[in-house]
Amino acid sequence: MSKPVKIGPWGGNGGSERDVQPKPIRMVSMTVSSGAIVDAIAFTYVGTDNVQHSSGIKWGGTGGTEDTINLDATNYVTEISGTVGKFGTDDIVTSLKIITSKGVTRTYGSGTGIPFRVPVLDGGKIAGFFGRAGAFLDAIGFYITP
């Protein structure tokens, strides 16, 4: 089994560091809370121990509307893009766009700020997240598996 690779993070330095143990090899579901910005994210995943785990409480605040994407071995995240920018005086994740292998596309937040994009090639998958969070999702990075 290949070890997941960390890519990123994108965003600001506010909030507290967020990460998971064991490291993820496949995402099972993800929940994003958003309005004008990305308020919070949470996910469940299969770890390097082949057991299902949760990221725990949402990383971020309590605002926004919640949306969940359920994934499986044939429907996985192949690309995430988004923007990071100012919200008040804080640098945070202002938008996310999620694309799955089955063509499911979801967009969260306003889309204002500096863009980033993480496409995964050759059958790779976005298996999980790490980053920083406080009252909002301050920064986000990704675990990629082949």
Swiss-Prot record:
Sections of the chain in a coiled coil: none
CDD domains named in the record: Jacalin
Residue ranges occupied by any Jacalin-type lectin domain in the UniProt entry: 4-146
Region of interest (Disordered), ranges: 1-21
GO cellular component: apoplast
PROSITE patterns from the UniProt entry: JACALIN_LECTIN
Keywords on record: Apoplast, Lectin, Mannose-binding, Secreted
Pfam families per record: Jacalin (PF01419)
Location in or out of the cell: Secreted, Extracellular space, Apoplast
Gene3D superfamilies listed in its UniProt record: Jacalin-like lectin domain
Function: Mannose-specific lectin. Has a weak agglutinating activity against rabbit erythrocytes.
Protein name: Horcolin
The species this protein was found in: Hordeum vulgare (Barley)
